[in-house]
Amino acid sequence: MATLLRSLALFKRNKDKPPITSGSGGAIRGIKHIIIVPIPGDSSITTRSRLLDRLVRLIGNPDVSGPKLTGALIGILSLFVESPGQLIQRITDDPDVSIRLLEVVQSDQSQSGLTFASRGTNMEDEADQYFSHDDPSSSDQPRFGWFENKEISDIEVQDPEGFNMILGTILAQIWVLLAKAVTAPDTAADSELRRWIKYTQQRRVVGEFRLERKWLDVVRNRIAEDLSLRRFMVALIQDIKRTPGNKPRIAEMICDIDTYIVEAGLASFILTIKFGIETMYPALGLHEFAGELSTLESLMNLYQQMGETAPYMVILENSIQNKFSAGSYPLLWSYAMGVGVELENSMGGLNFGRSYFDPAYFRLGQEMVRRSAGKVSSTLASELGITAEDARLVSEIAMHTTEDRISRAVGPRQAQVSFLHGDQSENELPRWEGKEDMRVKQSRGEARESYRETGPSRASDARAAHLPTDTPLDIDTASEPSQDPQDSRRSAEALLRLQAMAGISEEQGSDTDTPRVYNDRDLLE
């Protein structure tokens, strides 16, 4: 049996192992298309600001082709470094494209104010054609800018500090688009607006240079459809991270935005580890989780072997990303989601609409959190040197904190996944009722009758007398012995009023016919 287990572990390890690169075969190259990237040909701030202005207008032109749009975006993304040409040549290794760099300098003879640097050749007409400069004699009204502030006609400046602020503002809006351009483009607007507000408050961007939504939609769509552009952006992020010492302010801002970009599309894998394994609840000992725990262990090893590109596997369209989907460990993922919605309010808006979602293990995670509230891990306590007395104190404080958090019910709570309606009385589900459930309902019914006959104060005494001692107390209805007697009496009276009102509404709703609504218990039949 020990040999079988060793063979199984070796099999799982080799199954999820990435392919080993061999030096015998050559690299597979695809059919390349040419991308022209304009870069400044001198160190003048005027040249850079004028090039930035022309590229922003070029991107907003709806008639621009895809490769030309990619080249313009790469040109803007590399404008913040001293030598954009060297940066692009150093980090670009794409089998699908061939990048051609065109140096741009100032010109008084062209309509765009720029021309391509050449030796004795007049390139003003070609530069005007590339930048699609509007003819002043044309009857169509030219579009001067793509900013929400219509008073901004151009962004040409002479001051390096002002240029860096304008460039940083535009780059921040472009980089934020990468976070959800591939995984959730339809719901990206809200998160992008939050990032914009954050950087505006931090004075990293200038609010007046907020780009129009149409312009941002064009860039987001291009990022989503062009893998070569995403490869360049990821390579630029990694190159910035490898840079030692202090980095330029724009580079630090890009690293800050990278925290929202990494692990995009890997939420199921990361959250399963966070809520399913790191919480270390005893439910992990179930036999049903044994195989999936082994799968997760292999995936974590594979993630480490992939190196620095692992967090970007979805953005880079790496085929190995399918191994990390929740369909490879559905039971453990469903359990982890149940734990997550109980521990964090931010998990309440997560979409669980998956074919492999298991409601039973989702409720297992919920109940594991509820019943383990206030308990201290003995293993962790021994490692931290926590005494038994300290553990009891922590448990008592944690119980009060948990009750207070649940009673306030702050934020969205998707833990309430089942809803019982008026036509679904408790008698319709007899096989789900145990002895304890019958005793609790009997005690609640007697408490309601006592409230109607004797009033609030005597009803609370009747409720306390009829409540079974072996029945688990509900944290929403039970009071702690250490509470103030007046507070306990008021809480009991308020709860009894609500229960009495609920009983009256159930009696009134039993006479009306409503369509049958299935709850999550029916899913398990």
Swiss-Prot record:
Q: What is its main location?
A: virion
Q: Does the keyword Zinc apply?
A: no
Region (Disordered), start-end ranges: 418-525
Region entry Homomultimerization: which residue ranges?
1-36, 373-391
Which residue intervals make up region (RNA packaging and organization of the helical nucleocapsid)?
1-375
Q: Where is this region: Interaction with the phosphoprotein?
A: 477-505
Explain the post-translational modification: Phosphorylation at Thr-279 is required for the formation of the nucleocapsid.
Residue sites binding RNA per the record: 180, 195, 202, 260, 351
- Please tell me which stretches of this chain the record labels as motif Nuclear export signal: 425-440
Keywords, A to Z, come to: Capsid protein, Helical capsid protein, Host cytoplasm, Host nucleus, Host-virus interaction, Phosphoprotein, Ribonucleoprotein, RNA-binding, Viral nucleoprotein, Virion
Region Ntail, annotated ranges = 404-525
List compositional bias (Basic and acidic residues) regions by residue number. Answer: 428-452
Record region (Ncore):
1-403
Q: Name one GO molecular function term.
A: structural molecule activity
Residue(s) carrying Phosphothreonine? 279
- Keyword check for Phosphoprotein, yes or no: yes
Compartments annotated for it: namely:
Virion; Host cytoplasm; Host nucleus
**Any single Gene Ontology cellular-component annotation:** host cell nucleus
Q: Motif Nuclear localization signal at which residues?
A: 70-77
Q: What does this protein do?
A: Forms the helical nucleocapsid (NC) in a ratio of 1 N per 6 ribonucleotides, protecting the genome from nucleases. The nucleocapsid (NC) has a helical structure with either 12.35 or 11.64 N per turn, approximately 20 nm in diameter, with a hollow central cavity approximately 5 nm in diameter. The encapsidated genomic RNA serves as template for transcription and replication; encapsidation by N is coupled to RNA synthesis. Forms the encapsidation complex with the phosphoprotein protein P. Before encapsidation, the newly synthesized free N protein, so-called N0, is chaperoned by P.
- What remark about domains does the record contain? Ncore is globular and carries regions required for N self-assembly and RNA-binding. Ntail is an intrinsically disordered monomeric domain in the C-terminus.
Please give the subunit comment from the record: Homomultimer; forms the nucleocapsid. Binds to viral genomic RNA. N0 interacts (via Ncore) with the phosphoprotein (via N-terminus); this interaction allows P to chaperon N0 to avoid N polymerization and non-specific RNA binding before encapsidation. Interacts (via the Ntail) as N-RNA template with the phosphoprotein (via C-terminus XD); this interaction maintains the P/L complex anchored to the nucleocapsid template during the sequential transcription.
Family classification: Belongs to the paramyxoviruses nucleocapsid family.
What is the name of the protein in this document? Answer: Nucleoprotein
Q: Native species of this protein?
A: Measles virus (strain Yamagata-1) (MeV)
User: What is the gene called?
Assistant: N
